Curated annotation (Swiss-Prot):
Keyword Ion transport among record annotations: yes
Organism field: Saccharomyces cerevisiae (strain ATCC 204508 / S288c) (Baker's yeast)
Protein name: V-type proton ATPase subunit H
Encoding gene, per UniProt annotation: VMA13
An individual GO BP term: vacuolar acidification
MF term (GO), any: proton-transporting ATPase activity, rotational mechanism
Length: 478
């Protein structure tokens, strides 16, 4: 079986390589000045002649006393790695990294190049140590080289993948979505690594370095307020490719049910927005991945999958959206089936929903608003015992949310003020119906935070804080 080739469908990346190809390096002069060793320079020169100038009869075969049919082996690659580790000439090193990329991309020489590293995996470590350095062009090309090798059978190396994820040069390029062309190359490389199940644990371990960027790319596709919105057109626009490969990377990682659960918990709002993207995109490949990610996060293998489904229903308004999608005439049979499966999952869970489920989903989202349960006295009398369960778990969660907003948030921001108002209202209801909950308020320090809000500039916050204080004091002195 031949080597796996990464097809880097990036015009920008290919243009960078084309420009490097067009610039000849004075290999002989560098050898004469002893900037490079003679063997390193002659090897690079001969390879350039064969791969770039397409002149098979040039010097490598004669200098190595080999036959005229050029073959890749240790005599070809070891001098290149040696040059990269010893030279201070950045143009030379960029050119050599590009020559290695030419070998790996070549139908004629690619298999032999990979075979050399498979027979001597230590050489991959040597190459890695001299890669991902220099300007952004060299970082991208050398990144392409090491990833092209790391995905090959016999060359899997989790430690090197972790080193790659810790490389600030590569991560900085990935995180800069203003430079979409170069960001795209890095996401493609990471996505290629994620195809290998063996690498997914270490990739997820470093998810904070790339997941926010992936969701920012997807957010730009759905946020009509952004001047930089990436419009879902019919063309193979770079923006569409960025969306697709960002989603593909997320999808590959959510095959692991633990990662799927953590993704929803850490990025709930972004997860819910996947349905928004399905609504506006006309690219079925984008829709298919969005729906597949949602299905994997709703799988019974995922811890708290029922909670995820409830969040989709209550916070993501998923059921009417999916019902609407099910009426579209998609050509992709797999997509139509996935939408049907998701619709069935949502409908089954919807039958079992209660107003308390709605309340908990809202509390979990940390985005409290004046939805019906908060102002329905019947809701509180019917469900007050739920707030006592598990050592007042839900009540403590409510107090923690209030404290987080008071101590760390912008208490004057419009949305923050609403969250504080609603949290105070709910605490009042609990205290009135469960006077013993005042002990929990005391022990958590929540009472002091409520008192502090008596001086808030917003009249509704002040009013709700006063109600809560009166409820606390009323029972304290009974």
């Amino acid at each position: 079986m031949g080597a796996t080739k990464i097809l880097m469908d990036s015009t920008h990346f290919n243009e960078i390589r084309s420009i490097i190809r067009s610039r000849s390096v004075a290999w002989d002069a560098l050898a004469r000045s002893e900037e490079l060793s003679e063997i390193d320079a002659s090897t690079a020169k001969a390879l350039e002649s064969i791969l770039v100038k397409k002149n098979i009869g040039d010097g490598l075969s004669s200098s190595n006393n080999a036959h005229s049919g050029f073959k890749v082996n240790g005599k070809t690659l070891i001098p290149l790695i040696h040059l990269l580790s010893t030279s201070d000439n950045e143009d030379c090193k960029k050119s050599v990294q590009n020559l290695i990329a030419e070998l790996l991309s070549s139908d004629k020489y690619g298999d032999d190049t990979v075979k050399f590293f498979q027979e001597d995996p230590k050489q991959l470590e040597q190459l890695f140590d001299v890669s991902l350095k220099g300007d952004f062009q060299t970082v991208l090309i050398s990144g392409f080289n090491v990833v092209s090798l790391l995905v090959q059978n016999g060359l899997h190396n989790v430690k090197l993948v972790e080193k790659l994820l810790k490389n600030n040069n590569l991560i900085n390029i990935l995180q800069n979505i203003e430079q979409m062309d170069t960001c795209y190359v890095c996401i493609r490389l990471l996505q290629e690594l994620a195809v290998i199940p063996e690498y997914r644990d270490v990739i997820w371990l470093h998810e904070k370095k790339f997941m926010p960027t992936l969701f920012k790319i997807l957010q730009r596709a759905t946020d009509s307020q952004l001047a930089t919105r990436i419009v879902a057109t019919n063309s193979n626009h770079l923006g569409i490719q960025l969306q697709y490969h960002s989603l593909l990377l997320i999808w590959l990682l959510t095959f692991n049910p633990v990662f799927a659960n953590e993704l929803v918990q850490k990025y709930l709002s972004d997860f819910l927005d996947l349905l928004k993207l399905v609504k506006i995109t006309i690219k079925e490949k984008v829709s298919r991945l969005c729906i597949s990610i949602i299905l994997q996060c709703c799988s019974t293998r995922v811890k708290q999958h029922k909670k995820v489904i409830k969040q989709l229903l209550l916070l993501g308004n998923a059921l009417p959206t999916v019902q609407s999608l099910s009426e579209r005439k998609y050509s992709d049979e797999e997509l139509r089936q996935d939408i049907s499966n998701l619709k069935e999952i949502l409908e089954n869970e919807y039958q079992e929903l209660t107003s308390f489920d709605e309340y908990v989903a809202e509390l979990d989202s940390k985005l409290l608003c004046w939805s019906p349960p908060h102002v329905d006295n019947g809701f509180w009398s019917d469900n007050i015992d739920e707030f006592k369960k598990d050592n007042y778990k839900i009540f403590r969660q409510l107090i923690e949310l209030l404290q987080a907003k008071v101590r760390n948030g912008d208490v004057n921001a419009k949305q923050e003020k609403i969250i504080i108002q609603v949290a105070l209202n709910d605490i009042t209801h609990v205290v009135e119906l469960l006077p013993e909950s005042i002990d929990v308020l005391d022990k958590t320090g929540g009472k002091a935070d409520i008192m502090e809000l008596l001086n808030h500039s917003d009249s509704r916050v002040k009013y709700e804080a006063l109600k809560a204080t009166q409820a606390i004091i009323g029972y304290t002195f009974k």
